[in-house]
Amino acid sequence: MLFACALLALLGLATSCSFIVPRSEWRALPSECSSRLGHPVRYVVISHTAGSFCNSPDSCEQQARNVQHYHKNELGWCDVAYNFLIGEDGHVYEGRGWNIKGDHTGPIWNPMSIGITFMGNFMDRVPAKRALRAALNLLECGVSRGFLRSNYEVKGHRDVQSTLSPGDQLYQVIQSWEHYRE
């Protein structure tokens, strides 16, 4: 049985990751990033953009482009900072993806973590259930594909940097997740 599960995971059949919206679909600008992450990654850092929320594919694609534009054109980074962006439409938008180091949490955490951000401000409200479900599915996908350790740890952005991110309400939610560690 263990061999069958390992084979399914190796073939990518155990958990489908087809729910991830590729960069080409949300019309991302080309990335200029090249620093790669080593796998499997031990940490996942959850943040929020603290900006506008989105709840439809069109508005979330636009919001992902807005975040990328700000990071590339205003901050001068090589791409959108995050590995993945979560919309309240229930979709995961590919940022830098599983293989490229992000710019989401500073020089200590970026090389050893996947950065997942929820698009919107979650100080006073919880993200839609479908967005939370999408994030948990993404984490399962990462484990099944060997990008995340099976014993990965989820951290809130505020656990590793001085910030209010991921917002009070989202922070309260992620603290209940199985892999959350302060």
Curated annotation (Swiss-Prot):
Q: Which InterPro entries match?
A: Amidase/PGRP_sf, Amidase_domain, Peptidoglycan_recognition, PGRP, PGRP_domain_met/bac
Where does tissue-level expression of this protein occur? Strongly expressed in spleen and lung. Also detected in brain and thymus. In the lung, expressed in the intraalveolar space, in the brain, expressed in the Purkinje cells of the cerebellum and in certain layers of neurons in the hippocampus. Also detected in cells filling the space within the intestinal villus.
What disulfide bonds does the UniProt entry report for this chain?
Answer: 17-141, 33-78, 54-60
Q: Does the keyword Signal apply?
A: yes
The protein's location, in the record's own words, is: Cytoplasm; Secreted
Question: CDD domains per the record?
Answer: PGRP
The gene for this chain is Pglyrp1
> What function does this protein fulfil?
Innate immunity protein that plays several important functions in antimicrobial and antitumor defense systems. Acts as a pattern receptor that binds to murein peptidoglycans (PGN) of Gram-positive bacteria and thus provides bactericidal activity. Forms an equimolar complex with heat shock protein HSPA1A and induces programmed cell death through apoptosis and necroptosis in tumor cell lines by activating the TNFR1 receptor on the target cell membrane. In addition, acts in complex with the Ca(2+)-binding protein S100A4 as a chemoattractant able to induce lymphocyte movement.
GO CC annotations, alphabetized: cytoplasm; extracellular space
Q: Which Pfam families match?
A: Amidase_2 (PF01510)
Give the similarity note.
Answer: Belongs to the N-acetylmuramoyl-L-alanine amidase 2 family.
Q: What name has this protein been given in UniProt?
A: Peptidoglycan recognition protein 1
Q: What lineage is on file?
A: Eukaryota, Metazoa, Chordata, Craniata, Vertebrata
Signal peptide per UniProt: 1-18
Domain N-acetylmuramoyl-L-alanine amidase residues, every copy: 39-167
Q: Does the keyword ATP-binding apply?
A: no
Its GO biological process annotations read:
antimicrobial humoral immune response mediated by antimicrobial peptide; apoptotic process; biological process involved in interaction with host; defense response to Gram-positive bacterium; detection of bacterium; innate immune response; killing of cells of another organism; negative regulation of inflammatory response
Q: Which UniProt keywords apply?
A: Antibiotic, Antimicrobial, Apoptosis, Cytokine, Cytoplasm, Disulfide bond, Immunity, Innate immunity, Secreted, Signal
The record's subunit annotation is:
Homodimer; disulfide-linked. Interacts with HSPA1A; this interaction forms a cytotoxic complex that is released by lymphokine-activated killer cells. Interacts with HSPBP1; this interaction blocks the cytotoxic activity of the PGLYRP1-HSPA1A complex.
Q: Which GO terms describe its molecular function?
A: cytokine activity; Hsp70 protein binding; molecular adaptor activity; N-acetylmuramoyl-L-alanine amidase activity; peptidoglycan binding; peptidoglycan immune receptor activity; zinc ion binding
